[in-house]
């Protein structure tokens, strides 16, 4: 039997994102009374826990029997067009049933389906909306069905559809929250002294990276056949798997070295010197450096004082 969580117990195993929790709790409390849940858009960078928060919220969305509704997770990248959605997902699983649907990476929805959902989500005056698609008629009942959408690229959503959604946006995790996630993931491991804080400084401010670092520590402790992790162990692990100060990866170190040596660079020059494509630099390598304040872009790319310090720490033993 599924149990209903209270406002105070929801999300208790998820660290941080207090603003997200407050917003979702408000909408969940309302749904438990009215059976209507808004069309929520969970938006944030990769690894910030959108899917986990969606799953946890879904457990508190109640059906007419007062129990949690069934949950359906749809990877939108697998939906080729509206016809596939209606014939393979909506008709057999959603229509006429009580269900909470997560449309994950919803920016990847095909345009014809985004347009159709725009019509379906226009529900100012009714809980039931009938949508015609080609030769079929499909019925959405929003007292039976709730839709949660999640994306890392909200700017790619069809703007009119985005306007129909209730935004719940995520923030980066701070070092204290990162440390809490690692500790929660490894409840049986004792961290000695300030080693957990040192570990947290190398994590990329998101939940997924925190869990990945925790798994590395867990594997290390298993190989040593002990459940205690010290600063000496951390130094050994960093050496073995190549963990650098501030969590810098080799491509980022290469960019910082280039900027320090040359003073400043255009994107084309940085690409030529490092061998990384312009797209790879802009979409991946530069993002973390900009977020941490290790570089800035003022026409050309420049390293900052914080970037010089991070580079020196990351290359001190190299």
Predicted regions: what they are:
Residues 260-318:
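Terminal-proximal interaction/regulatory segments of ATP-powered molecular machines
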């Amino acid at each position: 039997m599924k149990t209903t969580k209270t406002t105070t117990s929801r999300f208790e195993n998820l660290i941080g994102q207090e603003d997200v929790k407050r917003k979702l709790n408000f909408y969940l409390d309302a749904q438990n009374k009215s059976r209507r849940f808004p069309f929520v858009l969970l938006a944030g960078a990769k690894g910030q826990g959108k899917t986990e928060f969606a799953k946890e919220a879904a457990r508190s969305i109640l059906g007419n029997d007062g129990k949690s509704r069934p949950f359906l997770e749809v990877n939108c990248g697998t939906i080729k067009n509206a016809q596939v959605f209606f014939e393979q997902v909506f008709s057999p699983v959603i229509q006429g049933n009580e269900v909470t649907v997560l449309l994950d990476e919803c920016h990847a929805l095909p345009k014809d389906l985004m347009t159709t959902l725009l019509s379906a989500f226009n529900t100012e005056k009714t809980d039931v909306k009938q949508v015609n698609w080609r030769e079929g008629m499909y019925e959405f009942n929003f007292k039976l069905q709730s839709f949660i959408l999640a994306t890392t690229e909200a700017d790619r959503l069809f703007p009119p559809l985005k306007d129909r959604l209730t935004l719940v946006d995520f923030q980066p995790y701070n070092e204290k929250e990162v440390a809490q996630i690692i500790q929660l993931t490894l409840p049986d491991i004792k961290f000695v002294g300030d080693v957990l804080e040192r570990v947290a400084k190398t994590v990329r401010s998101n939940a997924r990276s925190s869990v990945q670092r925790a798994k590395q520590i867990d594997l290390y402790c298993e190989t040593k056949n002990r459940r205690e992790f010290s600063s000496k162990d951390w130094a050994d692990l960093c050496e073995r798997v190549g963990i650098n100060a501030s969590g810098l990866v080799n491509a980022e170190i290469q960019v910082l070295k280039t900027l320090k040596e040359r003073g400043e660079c255009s994107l084309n020059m940085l690409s030529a010197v490092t061998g990384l494509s312009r797209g790879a630099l802009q979409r991946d390598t530069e993002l973390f450096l900009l977020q941490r304040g290790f570089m800035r872009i003022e026409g050309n790319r420049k390293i900052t004082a914080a970037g010089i310090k991070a580079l020196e720490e990351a290359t001190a033993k190299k």
